[in-house]
């Protein structure tokens, strides 16, 4: 007998619609503010009808920055993209090779090495960040893409997830590869890597957003304005000297900052969902 859940379904849909509206309303307000001029954005209460100045504000910050910040926001977006993409590729490469070595290579203390990697998750960021900055400074990597990305490429979480996935692969695959004369890297490239594509897609999305949203690390590691990132740069656009903040331009910068991660999620959403589902099996 099929249970009649019409009332429950209606309630759930109403709650979902309310939740979506609560999430989208601040984004809509930011969009409206980005479309106003300098005088309209300070009117109280601010209008909720979009104005005609969106592209003008975007063009201004893209080439000239916001307010006294003369760094073009287009350059900040480029720095953020380079940082996020390098961190993503580095994390996935290091993690998948580490997990592959731990699962398929028989060497002494391999489980100990895995647990030493896993234990780094228990160290708070505040404990690790200042020693890392000192190392980067001693290597003369401040104000560089290498300094922005290299310390964030190691990931115990991704290594753990890849290890757990590799352990679910049947041993018959390895035995068949050995019979066919495939070496370790051939087995990895032709068999393990194609089977891991959904997990790779899920980790790519998660890691890209992680790298894109970095705020504290770029602030600590860079002093050159030309190496600033978008997320960290937005904070510098807000006036702290008593001068009015040009909120229309700040909101335009925030809208631009949202676009790259949204595009990544939309392009890879099918593989992303499949990767999350496969990782739970």
Curated annotation (Swiss-Prot):
Domain ABC transmembrane type-1: residue ranges: 77-268
Gene Ontology terms: biological process: transmembrane transport
Alphabetical list of Gene3D superfamilies matching this protein: MetI-like (1.10.3720.10)
Any one of the GO CC terms: plasma membrane
Keywords noted in UniProt: Cell inner membrane, Cell membrane, Membrane, Transmembrane, Transmembrane helix, Transport
Topology with respect to the bilayer: Multi-pass membrane protein
Residue spans crossing the bilayer: 14-34, 85-105, 113-133, 142-162, 201-221, 247-267
Domain of life: Bacteria
Subcellular location: Cell inner membrane
InterPro entries noted in UniProt: MetI-like (IPR000515), MetI-like_sf (IPR035906)
Main location: membrane
Entry-linked Pfam families: BPD_transp_1 (PF00528)
Oligomer and partners: The complex is composed of two ATP-binding proteins (UgpC), two transmembrane proteins (UgpA and UgpE) and a solute-binding protein (UgpB).
Protein family according to the UniProt entry: Belongs to the binding-protein-dependent transport system permease family. UgpAE subfamily.
Family annotation (PANTHER family): ABC TRANSPORTER PERMEASE PROTEIN MG189-RELATED-RELATED, SN-GLYCEROL-3-PHOSPHATE TRANSPORT SYSTEM PERMEASE PROTEIN UGPE
Known function: Part of the ABC transporter complex UgpBAEC involved in sn-glycerol-3-phosphate (G3P) import. Probably responsible for the translocation of the substrate across the membrane.
Full protein name: sn-glycerol-3-phosphate transport system permease protein UgpE
Higher taxonomy: Bacteria, Pseudomonadati, Pseudomonadota, Gammaproteobacteria, Enterobacterales
Protein's gene: ugpE
């Amino acid at each position: 007998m099929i249970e009649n859940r019409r009332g429950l379904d209606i309630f759930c849909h109403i709650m979902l619609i309310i939740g979506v509206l609560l999430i989208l309303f601040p984004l809509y307000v930011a969009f409206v503010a980005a479309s106003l001029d300098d005088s309209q954005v300070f009117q109280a209460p601010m209008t909720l009808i979009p104005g005609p100045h969106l592209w003008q504000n975007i063009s201004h910050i893209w080439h000239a920055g916001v307010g006294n910040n003369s760094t073009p926001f287009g350059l900040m977006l480029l720095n953020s993209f380079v940082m996020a993409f390098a961190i993503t590729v580095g994390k996935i490469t290091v993690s998948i090779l580490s997990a592959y070595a731990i699962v398929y290579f028989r060497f002494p203390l391999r489980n100990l090495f895995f647990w030493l990697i896993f234990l780094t998750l228990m160290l708070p960021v505040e404990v690790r960040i200042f020693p890392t900055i000192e190392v980067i400074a001693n290597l003369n990597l401040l104000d560089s893409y290498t300094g922005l990305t290299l310390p964030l490429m190691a990931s115990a979480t991704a290594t753990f997830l890849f290890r757990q996935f590799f352990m679910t692969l049947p041993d018959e695959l390895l035995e068949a590869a050995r019979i066919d004369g495939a070496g370790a890297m051939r087995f990895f490239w032709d068999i393990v890597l194609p089977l891991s594509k959904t997990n790779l897609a899920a980790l790519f999305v998660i890691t890209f957003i992680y790298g894109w949203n970095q705020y504290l690390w770029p602030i600590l590691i860079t002093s050159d304005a030309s190496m600033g990132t978008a997320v960290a740069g937005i904070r510098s656009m807000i006036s702290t000297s008593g001068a009015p903040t040009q909120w229309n331009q700040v909101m335009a910068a925030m809208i631009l900052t949202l676009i790259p991660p949204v595009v990544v999620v939309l392009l890879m959403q099918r593989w992303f969902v499949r990767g999350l589902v496969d990782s739970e099996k």
